Amino acid sequence: MCIRDSKYSVTTYGPDRNKVLTLVNSFHGRTLATLTATGQDVFHKDFGPFPANFGYIPANDFDTFKAAVDDSVCAVMMEMVQGEGGVVALDADYVQSVADYCHAHDILIIVDEVQTGVGRTGTFLCCEHYNLKPDIVTLAKGLGGGLPIGAVLMNEKVAEGMGPGSHGSTFGGNPVVCAGANVVLARMDQSFLANVSERAVQLRAGLAKLPMVKNLSGIGLMVGIEFFGGIQAADVLAACREKGLLVLTAKSRLRLLPPLTLTAHDVEKALGILNEVLTEMEQKAPKEQA
């Protein structure tokens, strides 16, 4: 958590204002600091001791957020869609209320776009759906198109407190990965993002018609599926894999993170496999549960 220990934090807030609030069910990484920022005990198991001065608040509960803010809080960090937390999107009203409060009280807004960023939700950054302009944005995964890269975007206010060498990583800025990232960024034009949005609409419409689907969550091509009838997402995952479709799970939901280059034909093929799997499970499910 570079911002908590950065020159910006110390010179702007003083050494005693160094607490970061994150959300319950969040996931922010696997270093000790980002594990601490992660609001899920399951990821803390077998690690530690952890850095101090992090606090966890429930998502979409503005009153609890306000009650948690004291003179030690310098930043709040959020995922617009909690991926590892069940593919749950934050409420727009909650995000706006938090943003207004942070701006009024000089609290930095950090948005973790590692899963949601670089076109995943149909906009370059997911926070665009919320009309949110964070002070800091973290990126990785999609930025490299399969190559390992991470980036931190910041506004001028924060950047003024950073200097050459103040933060970095072993392979940060290496030319091969940056060349790959440049290709990815060049592809992120309006027509590319429009296709992502169109395929998301197609996918979600098809999923809603499938048997045993209770509800859908997420934004764009970041989709969570909850099932009726006691069907377990892990069982659906295994059955899909046998038929050639790779999916994930998150909490009790099936999680879909398809390639952003997918076509209408790809969507229909995936829907066909899911339909086969869920139809078979529906036939085996107790009638009173289905």
What are these regions (language model features)?
Residues 1:
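Proteins enriched for Cys/Gly/acidic motifs involved in redox and nucleic-acid/cofactor modification
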Residues 4-290:
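Conserved N-terminal phosphate-binding loop of PLP-dependent enzymes in the Aspartate aminotransferase
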